[in-house]
From Swiss-Prot:
Membrane topology annotation: Multi-pass membrane protein
Family listed: Belongs to the UPF0391 family.
Transmembrane segments: 4-24, 30-50
Protein name: UPF0391 membrane protein msr3702
Subcellular location field: Cell membrane
Length: 54
């Protein structure tokens, strides 16, 4: 699950860079939402991995 969270975070960062840079101005809001959703998934996955090992 951590692997997929990292993959989706990278995709969201790329989409965010395109959206925030003005290349795809209409999708900037969607890119922002996806970025923060997948960032939250990354944090949750990291915490779950830490608690699972402890």
């Amino acid at each position: 699950m951590l692997y997929w969270a990292l993959v989706f975070l990278v995709v969201a960062i790329i989409a965010g860079a395109l959206g925030f840079g003005g290349i795809a101005g209409t999708s900037a809001g969607i890119a922002q939402i996806l970025f923060f959703i997948f960032l939250a998934f990354l944090v949750i996955s990291l915490l779950a991995g830490l608690f699972r090992r402890a």
